[in-house]
Amino acid sequence: MQPNDITFSQRFQDDILAGRKTITIRDESESHFKTGDVLRVGRFEDDGYFCTIEVTATSTVTLDTLTEKHAEQENMTLTELIKVIADIYPGQTQFYVIEFKCL
């Protein structure tokens, strides 16, 4: 079985598959992905594969430069997005936006 290249919390699986979540915001440890990369996607909880995505763009962002557009691409409100990012990456301010589409 092939390993997954990137994982998402299971709660995001349906939004990714339906095209409602089209970005992910990660810390420096996952800043190596590049436009055009094709990635196997698994669930964080059990590493079970659920789709393949293609990276369509990458950029950097800070907590204070997150926008409503980022929130829309994450399928949540801006307030929710800032809280989720702060909870996952406490004390960090520099992040990497990975835009993607399901293949």
UniProtKB/Swiss-Prot annotation:
EC number: 3.5.1.135
GO MF annotation: an example: hydrolase activity, acting on carbon-nitrogen (but not peptide) bonds, in linear amidines
A cellular component annotation (GO) from this entry: cytosol
Keyword Hydrolase: yes
InterPro entries for this protein: AC4CH, ASCH_domain, PUA-like_sf
Catalytic activity: N(4)-acetylcytidine + H2O = cytidine + acetate + H(+); N(4)-acetyl-2'-deoxycytidine + H2O = 2'-deoxycytidine + acetate + H(+); N(4)-acetylcytosine + H2O = cytosine + acetate + H(+)
One Pfam family hit: ASCH
Enzymatic class: hydrolase
Annotated TM spans: none
Gene3D superfamilies from the UniProt entry: Hypothetical protein
Similarity comment text for this entry: Belongs to the N(4)-acetylcytidine amidohydrolase family.
Record's function text: Catalyzes the hydrolysis of N(4)-acetylcytidine (ac4C).
Protein name in UniProt: N(4)-acetylcytidine amidohydrolase
Provenance organism: Shigella boydii serotype 4 (strain Sb227)
Gene: yqfB
